[in-house]
Amino acid sequence: MPSLGLGTWQAPPGQVNQAVCDALELGYRHVDCASLYGNEAEIGAALQRAFQSGLVQREELWITSKLWNDCHAPEQVRPALLRSLRDLGLEHLDLYLIHWPVVHRHGVLMPERASEQIPLEQMPLQDTWRAMEALVDEGLVREIGVSNFSAIKIDSLLQHARRRPTVNQVERHPWLQQNALLGYCQHQGIQLTAYSPLGSSSSNGQPSLLDDPVICAIAEEHRASPPQVLLAWGLATGTAVIPKSVHRDRLASNL
């Protein structure tokens, strides 16, 4: 898996297609997707453009998607994957993740009441994981992993797993370093991938990591941009990073 990839969370509709094409032209070979993001069909159109033009071959790319919380029932896992494959226009994924260790009732994307959630005691993660393992057996997925899992959740999963998670994808940056989780994953041979490596989106006047005085000072000293400093920190500390942008100049700068 390439250590630097393109994140597509909150990529605006109508812009992500061109962003993916630009990223592939610039040299990105890792694209991170998820059914929840609602843009896999647009990403798929960009991938098909790239394949048909000869820009890249399928085997050159690493494509990740994620199982949403309302499809944890074992009988729902394969259909959810097939929908992502259909939208992306692919025959297989390189990596498929359980998006969160949380279960919603089927068809509920974002629960508004407790009754729309299902306790893990009623739908254990290990049952979902067995269905994920079956996707690898079938050749629909090369690797499987998790996202937003704590060390405790991974430990519990490992007690029942036939295949170990390849990746745990979590938010990680200098303001949320998660070093204990990083050390745990490294000990277990699990690659930690950092989403929001440039910090969470700021709003309501909250400070931005990109404006952090220490980050800005390091950037100035090394004649780099704050995003370049943050991505270098993530890579140097052992994580893969998947920054998101739909702007070609920023995509180039992040490489």
Regions found by a protein language model. Give the residues of each.
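N-terminal binding-site loop/beta-alpha segment at the start of enzyme catalytic domains
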Residues: 1-61, 78, 131, 198-202
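Active-site mouth loops of central-metabolism enzymes
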Residues: 2-15, 66-75, 116-123
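Short, acidic/polar
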Residues: 11-24, 73-88, 125-127, 152-156, ...
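Residues at the N-termini of beta-strands
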Residues: 30, 92-95, 143, 167
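Short helix-capping segments at alpha-helix termini
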Residues: 49-59, 88-90, 135-140, 160-164
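A short, structured active-site edge motif that brings together acidic residues
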Residues: 57-71, 95-101, 169-172
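Beta/alpha (TIM)-barrel catalytic core signal, keyed to glycine-rich beta->alpha loops juxtaposed to Asp/Glu
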Residues: 69, 101-255
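CE4/NodB-like, metal-dependent polysaccharide N-deacetylase domain
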Residues: 77-98, 134-138
